[in-house]
């Protein structure tokens, strides 16, 4: 019996307020409007960005259904949708690609102006919501809201992928892998023979390590205070691993001494102001490039001496690894299917969706790299 055009009742993890656990609720998911797509979720990863909302470090309207790193199957489409159809395997895109705005038309940029990250409204692009719980409208998150058995997204925020794709693996390409890997190959444009430093060895940081290796870096120095992550980092391409707590001097000074004045490329993949500054300072003052990948805390600012940049450093930011999402994500999935890279090492835990709070506990304890929830 077709559910197209009907309200679907299903389970979703609702965050009612910050610093509280998710609540598994019965929700109603409205049919997609014109140029929208309703997706049956199959697998979703737990990303640190979702946790930033829980902790209050990333502000978005609540109550909300979070989640943005996922893969699923199209259940139905609204009027006018042409790029996907019911039955297609897809990845929702937390940064859309409308193809019409100034950013989308610029070949060097990917931060589509239809995004809901910079100033989140908690709605779809038409300003309305598709979720209801206990008679109350529930906000969306980043236009994806994948912590739900069904979700609705805009057509420009979903990408059709290879029909043979294992969704419980390629869901990581929806955020973590693409963000980290792309920050190295697209944003920093790591060069063969170069020296790199990666701050933070979670799923995104390890993906940045993989990107540095793929780009031909000669030295990849992984930096984290959790030594348990070092073996995995070396498995994925790190040549050295260091713990800032093992040194009396600032970690940027340690790195500069190790690399004859500083690394060529550095990546902050944590989302802390102190490590953002350390990442900048550890790259060479005349030719180094530092990339901010981690989502920074809300309402906090960095203050720097302009001389740090005047001498020749470059300081950049990266969203979605610089990939134009609707074009780039299917290509990454195709590369995965062609065995150009593996995602297995990043997935440390697989849990049923109902155990979402256990998944976040694993994240907080530092025991997981990526936990994938299956529906």
Swiss-Prot record:
Modified residues (Phosphoserine): 23
Residues at which NAD(+) binds: 200-205, 224, 229, 293-295, 370
Cross-referenced Pfam families: ADH_N, ADH_zinc_N
Molecular-function GO terms, alphabetical: all-trans-retinol dehydrogenase (NAD+) activity; zinc ion binding
Keyword NAD on entry: yes
Classification via InterPro entries: ADH-like_C, ADH-like_N, ADH_Zn_CS, GroES-like_sf, NAD(P)-bd_dom_sf, PKS_ER
Positions of modified residues (N-acetylserine): 2
Function text: Catalyzes the NAD-dependent oxidation of all-trans-retinol and its derivatives such as all-trans-4-hydroxyretinol and may participate in retinoid metabolism. In vitro can also catalyze the NADH-dependent reduction of all-trans-retinal and its derivatives such as all-trans-4-oxoretinal. Catalyzes in the oxidative direction with higher efficiency. Has the same affinity for all-trans-4-hydroxyretinol and all-trans-4-oxoretinal.
Protein residues bound to Zn(2+) 2: 98, 101, 104, 112
Keywords of this entry: Acetylation, Cytoplasm, Lipid metabolism, Metal-binding, NAD, Oxidoreductase, Phosphoprotein, Zinc
Family that this chain belongs to: Belongs to the zinc-containing alcohol dehydrogenase family.
Any single Gene Ontology cellular-component annotation: nucleoplasm
Highest taxon listed in the record's lineage: Eukaryota
Protein name per UniProt: All-trans-retinol dehydrogenase [NAD(+)] ADH1B
PANTHER family cross-referenced by the UniProt entry: ALCOHOL DEHYDROGENASE, ALL-TRANS-RETINOL DEHYDROGENASE [NAD(+)] ADH1B
Subunit-structure text: Homodimer or heterodimer of closely related subunits.
Subcellular location, principal: cytoplasm
Subcellular location per the Swiss-Prot or TrEMBL entry: Cytoplasm
Cofactor comment: Binds 2 Zn(2+) ions per subunit.
